[in-house]
Amino acid sequence: TIATVPLSKKDYEDYYLGFSNSVIWPVFHNRLDLAKFSATQVEGYRRVNIEFANRLSPLLRPSDLIWIHDYHLIPLAAHLRVNGHRNPIGFFLHISFPTPDVLVAAPEHEWLMDSFLSYDLVGFQTALDADNFHRFLLNFEGTSQSENKLVARGRTIVTGVFPIGIDVEAFAAMAHTQEAEERIERLHRRATPRVHIIGVDRLDYTKGLPERLHAFRRLLELHPENRKVATLMQIAAPTREDVEIYVEIRKELEQLSGAINGEFGDFDWT
């Protein structure tokens, strides 16, 4: 069963563009300087998660195992508990988890952390993320820890580290298909004998894209023998184009690439 929940423009702005991506995303990536907090937006984040819980509740059976994903939905389990559901609920955080000293500087941090206590299992990408989570919760009065189990405020939660990866064998097999080999051969015939540095990322300030361009520029300055030899091709897929900081980083990258090409480029090399 697939259930859809329509969001109003205000919901989208407060919940998604606002608290999710203007507070949680930068804070959880240790960028407090980019966080923009608004009481209206945190209320929108609560409101939409309550709506999700209310829409989901009639569809749940007592035997269902509930698995919730990522920072947009941290309080969802708490609202499901309020609705009377005692199902086992797991949560996986797809992004990093900040150090306690960073998190404590963020508005509503204790409410967010209290929301995690409604889960039975909380999963992280790395052991460092799980350790940051444990260290913060151990500041709660009466919290105890036993290996990967935490008891806090009358709730027991288990944490785990489940790194996400790709299907290496499938990708390797795809690279050796006849179609792939033909495309590679065509590319070799067209390409000049140069060093190609290729990056593929979302257009996001957490990816270090300006730093990458600055590093390439520095390479060309300090080692001019790489001019006309090395080519940097950066593929940056646009994302969250309604969030101001993403508009700014796109402009910064366009200006940087233009400046580098203007300074070092030639008619047959950019």
Give the ranges of each region predicted by the language model.
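Catalytic cores of carbohydrate-active enzymes across secretory and cytosolic contexts
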Residues: 1-270
